[in-house]
Structures are given as C-alpha cells and as structure tokens.
Amino acid sequence: MTISLAKGQKVDLTKTNPGLSKVVVGLGWDTNKYDGGHDFDLDSSVFLLDAAGKCASPNDFIFYNQLEGGNGSVVHSGDNLTGAGEGDDENVKVNLSAVPANIDKISFVITIHDAEARSQNFGQVSNAFVRIVNEETNEELIRYDLAEDFSIETAIIAGELYRHNGEWKFSAIGSGYQGGLARIATDYGLQVG
C-alpha cells in the first residue's frame, strides 16, 4: 500500500519494509501547453551528501552526464528529453545496503535545462512527483505529489532519503530555487563553472 506524503512529512522506509534494500526512485512531471517558445527539458539529478549536508567530491553528483555514484549504489536511468507520456520520466536505482557509510542523505532534484535562456520556470510545470518503488516487487511504497505553488523557480529539491538510527527514511521536501542546478550544486559544496 502506497503512503502518500505532503510537503514536510517524513516516513520510515526500511523500518516499515524489513529486508528492503533495492529501490527505484521515480520522478515525473508534465509541462503546461502554451503557444510558441521552446520545448521543455526537465532533468533529475541526485546529490550524495555527508553529515554536513555537502558532497565530498564531484563523484557524489549523479546526473545525465554522470549516471553512477556511491561506488555503484546509485544509478541514474539517463535523460528523458521530452517528459512525454505517463509514469516516471526519469528514475534512479538505489541499493540502500551498498550506499557508502559516509553518505548520510541522498537528495533528489528536478531542474529545467536552460531555464533562464528559454524563459521557463516551474510555474509552467504540473503534476510533478517523486515516488519510491521496491525494485524487486515493483510495489510503490511512497509517493509525494508536489503542490503546484511554484512560479519563478527553475529547480526543486523534491525529496531526500536519509539515514536515521541505522534505518533509511524519506522526507518530502518540495523546496523551489531560482538559479537552477548550479545554485543547488553550489549549496551542496560543489564548484560550478
């Protein structure tokens, strides 16, 4: 049975699902139809964070140009250029039992590629979600539908998996940012540019 979360809610993942080690984190979205302009290219990215909330190295940033991190414990499906169709637009496989011990938190981000140049923002995006699926059974465990209260933001931290007392939990974040992926990467301690 799927647990639906609202912004700010946290839920146990491994404690309530004993033996769970491999999950798929699916991210999805729709773009609002409007005349003219450029096509949207939304991207999901993953940041592997230490206890200080920072990436220890550029290898802790997983995205369409670096599909794997955490010694192979986190694998990105690759870039979906259109976001068309039903279901997940992009997904990330996480082997929770293999995530390196120095990683305390795994942050899942959705950004709009070239948002500023294309005059695009999350006010033009709807039905964004993040969900967690048991990779072995394909059962949806957790779903967080992001509210559509974004306007000028070009990046969203959708949610985070984090360690707590030896277990993994999920937090529905839903925080929007201006400045796109570069702003979030900088906040997470990476050099950009």
UniProtKB/Swiss-Prot annotation:
- What does the entry say induces or represses the expression of this protein? By heat shock, salt stress, oxidative stress, glucose limitation and oxygen limitation.
Q: Name one Pfam family in it.
A: TerD
Keyword set, alphabetical order: Stress response
**CDD domains found in the cross-reference section:** TerD_like
Keyword Hydrolase included in the entry's annotation:
no
* InterPro entries linked to this entry: Stress/Tellurium_Resist, TerD
Per its UniProt record, what PANTHER family does this chain match?
A: CAMP-BINDING PROTEIN 1-RELATED (PTHR32097), GENERAL STRESS PROTEIN 16U (PTHR32097:SF4)
Family to which the UniProt record says this protein belongs: Belongs to the CAPAB/TerDEXZ family.
> Which protein is depicted?
General stress protein 16U
**Source species of the chain:** Bacillus subtilis (strain 168)
